[in-house]
């Protein structure tokens, strides 16, 4: 299924299913169309137009009204039946950061496939065995033990540290679990959205272009007017959001607004 209406049909209490007097009673469905964008190479599309670049991600969420419960949708960058993310993007850490920042902050339930957190690769064209390789370590004779800090390579540790920090932050944030979403149509291949509830607000900026961008915060006044700063959840840096925000090429910024 690669259409939101098809997927929404299978979620419990679907209005689309009700047309045929059908209710699957399945509480959760998988966001295959978001995966289609991620797995289709969206983060390689540095030059954007009406059907290229980060607009593909934006358009996925414009159809959320079709789902009975958007908080109970499974979001993922890869799984046991797909190409590994790091196969598609050749281990590009910046693109991994962008994808995981997206998966961790949009509505729904994030799914991590084992090995994502250390940058594992696997080619579906080679066969299912290649995308389901053994996780390195745990057996005598394994040359690489990625179960421990000491056993990971420098590259594996880089992926692991980022993933751990991001998702440990997420697990404490009800604003991400059940908060509302406001998103804005991308400009210059930069996608900005907000997750918020009555007590918190998080601003997410994803720059999919290959150039540093200046993001005009005034465009998002509806969501920023009561805040003056944002804390970067990864670096801990505090950013003034009353002015334009600079964001590096091929990067994501997650800000807790204050």
Where are these regions (language model features)?
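Conserved, mostly hydrophobic/aromatic
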Residues: 80, 103, 115-117, 166, ...
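Active-site clefts of carbohydrate-active enzymes
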Residues: 70-91
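Solvent-exposed beta-hairpin/edge-strand motifs
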Residues: 220-236
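Asparagine-centered strand-capping/turn motif at beta-strand->loop junctions
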Residues: 205-209
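Surface beta-strand/loop "capping" patches
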Residues: 179-200
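C-terminal beta-strand-rich structural cap/linker in extracellular carbohydrate-active enzymes
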Residues: 241-258
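Active-site-proximal helices and loops of the catalytic beta/alpha 8
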Residues: 1-66, 91-93, 102, 119-165, ...
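Structural recognition of the beta-strand scaffold that forms the well-ordered cores
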Residues: 74-77, 102-105, 110-114, 120, ...
